[in-house]
């Protein structure tokens, strides 16, 4: 016997009522899975900043982070070499609104470099760039930035005996700070390319956005990044 139309309609409504919460849960789960790498990078960036603030060799960094117009953070900058060398890592860029003092949502980038000449070894580093000038901010927002060419970079003062009064090359657009372990004596970022990862920003914010959309126009938000921005404010307030 075939059920009559009213019974069929009620059955369909019941099925839809039961399915909608399940579909909503599945959609949320898939969204979390889709941006898992991006969320991990934001979390790692917060940890890197926390590591820098706790490092006794980063006195100057702690004393001057409030002067930065922007921060570029790479939690894992890997370098390896056997005659020829290559280095790279993913990072985030955030900038400060000069009027309100509020920090932007993170834009996603990759940083990479190649080197030549005899070299051997491997190294993992944490990198933070203090962006000191508007030129540095604007160049990064273009999404394809080369350190030393599109903006000047200098090595920031590092060491337990370095006081906040020590003056580095403040004419540079960016100051680089590196915490490294490995067989290399040091890490040079001169010539490294910083390229926006628009597909990562899309995954994190759920729609296509450029670095300018994120950092300047502030068209998107992701509550997950609140912990990173809170860590930046904590760093500034502790001064």
Where are these regions (language model features)?
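Boundary at the C-terminal end of the N-terminal hydrophobic targeting segment
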Residues: 29-33
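Small-residue-enriched, tightly packed secondary-structure blocks
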Residues: 34-239
């Amino acid at each position: 016997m075939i059920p009559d139309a009213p019974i069929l309609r009620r059955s369909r409504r019941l099925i839809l009522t039961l399915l909608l919460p399940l579909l909503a849960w599945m959609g949320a789960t898939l969204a979390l899975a889709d941006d898992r790498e991006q969320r991990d990078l934001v979390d790692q960036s917060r940890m890197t900043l926390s590591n820098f603030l706790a490092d006794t060799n980063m006195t100057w960094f702690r004393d001057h982070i409030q002067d930065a117009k922007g921060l570029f953070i790479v939690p894992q900058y890997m370098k390896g070499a056997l005659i020829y060398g290559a280095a790279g890592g993913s990072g985030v860029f955030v900038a400060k609104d000069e009027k309100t003092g509020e920090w932007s949502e993170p834009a996603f980038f990759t940083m990479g470099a190649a080197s030549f000449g005899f070299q051997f070894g491997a190294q993992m580093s944490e990198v933070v760039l203090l962006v000191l000038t508007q030129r540095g901010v604007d160049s990064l927002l273009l999404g394809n930035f080369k350190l030393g060419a599109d903006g000047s970079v200098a090595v920031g003062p590092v060491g337990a005996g370095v006081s906040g009064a020590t003056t580095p090359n403040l004419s540079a657009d960016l100051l680089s700070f590196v915490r490294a372990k490995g067989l290399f004596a040091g890490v040079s970022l001169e010539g490294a390319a910083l390229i926006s990862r628009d597909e990562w920003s899309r995954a994190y914010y759920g729609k296509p956005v450029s670095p300018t959309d994120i950092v300047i126009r502030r068209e998107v938000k992701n509550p997950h990044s609140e912990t990173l921005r809170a860590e930046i404010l904590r760093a500034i307030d502790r001064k």
